[in-house]
């Protein structure tokens, strides 16, 4: 493998290098789950490396490169298992072959259905699209981060037809065709809730309930939150450290996927001991989420500063698990 650097432990492997070089070493039907956030088709540039999928000249060029990754993910995923993609609408006009990126800070900028094009690509590569979750974002927080004038109250004063939406993130679910050889079963239901809501105290007695599962009110409550198509209970700031990973000329965008989102995906769509893979590792969030839930995590990241931050973050995974055990 043309890998720049690697860190291999019993329960995780981190690679600094091209994700295609990492994936080609996997045998067919090996991965229990993949979860990742791809570069948003050039909306943010993370490096000048020509292998970096964020470093593209057009929306179409991004998808031409991304298709190779999706096909490899299809090959290495177990039949019947899930590939989860975190994404959102992006500023611009048109879709597919006509799409042209715009600037999100400009008033009146349209939106490109980036999730829709991801869905169509996955279907082209053999995946079955089987649902999406929307992840709520606080409007003022989005306004302050992006400085989009269309989210400012002043735009209401001037012309509210040009107001924007604090666009929700989306987690798309794709299932590989075929029968799942190892069901992801939960004989005593779900044991832990990842989110900001407070579970009613009287339900705690049902945690790990071994009786008739129709009576497991603890797990039922968690599942109602997870089954919703709109996740408005994600702790937005529950992310891994990332500030040290920034280069001096970095975009301001770097913001890892929330651990609540990752934990839900890992628990729902993989078994303990299975491999969870992320081709766009960033600072290691998906690998971390796999490891702390007794899975094996593998991640590939091209950018050296992100990789080094991932190494630091994963080194603290045992400490995190210990702290969580003390909280229980």
Regions found by a protein language model. Give the residues of each.
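Core catalytic lobe of class I
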Residues: 2-309, 327
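PRPP-dependent phosphoribosyltransferase catalytic core
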Residues: 308-328
């Amino acid at each position: 493998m043309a890998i720049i650097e690697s860190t291999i432990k019993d329960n995780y492997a981190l690679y600094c290098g091209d994700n295609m070089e990492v994936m080609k070493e996997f045998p067919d039907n090996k991965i229990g789950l993949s979860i990742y956030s791809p570069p948003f088709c050039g909306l943010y540039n993370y490096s000048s490396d020509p292998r970096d999928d964020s470093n593209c000249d057009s929306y179409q060029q991004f998808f031409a490169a991304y298709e190779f990754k999706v096909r490899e993910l299809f090959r290495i995923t177990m039949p019947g298992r899930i590939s989860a993609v975190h994404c959102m609408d992006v500023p611009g006009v048109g879709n597919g072959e006509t799409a042209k990126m715009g600037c999100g800070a400009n008033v009146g900028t349209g939106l490109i259905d980036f999730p829709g094009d991801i869905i169509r690509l996955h279907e082209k590569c053999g995946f079955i699209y089987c649902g999406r979750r929307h992840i709520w974002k606080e409007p003022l927080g989005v306004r302050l981060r992006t400085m989009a004038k269309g989210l400012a109250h002043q735009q209401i004063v001037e012309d509210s037809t040009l107001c924007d939406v604090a666009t929700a993130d989306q987690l798309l679910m794709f299932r590989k065709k075929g029968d799942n050889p190892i069901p992801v079963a939960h004989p005593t239901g779900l044991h832990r809730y990842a989110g900001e809501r407070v579970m009613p105290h009287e339900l705690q007695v049902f945690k790990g309930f071994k009786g008739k599962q129709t009576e497991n009110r603890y797990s039922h409550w968690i599942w109602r939150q997870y089954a919703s198509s709109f996740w408005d209970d994600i702790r937005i700031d529950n992310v891994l450290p990332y500030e040290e990973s920034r280069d001096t000329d970095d975009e301001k965008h770097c913001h890892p996927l929330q651990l609540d989102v990752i934990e839900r995906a890992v628990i729902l769509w993989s078994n303990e001991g299975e491999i969870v893979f992320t081709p766009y590792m960033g600072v290691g969030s998906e690998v971390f989420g796999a490891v702390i839930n007794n899975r094996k995590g593998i991640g590939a990241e091209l950018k050296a500063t992100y990789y080094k931050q991932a190494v630091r973050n994963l080194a603290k995974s045992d400490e995190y698990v210990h702290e969580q055990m003390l909280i229980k």
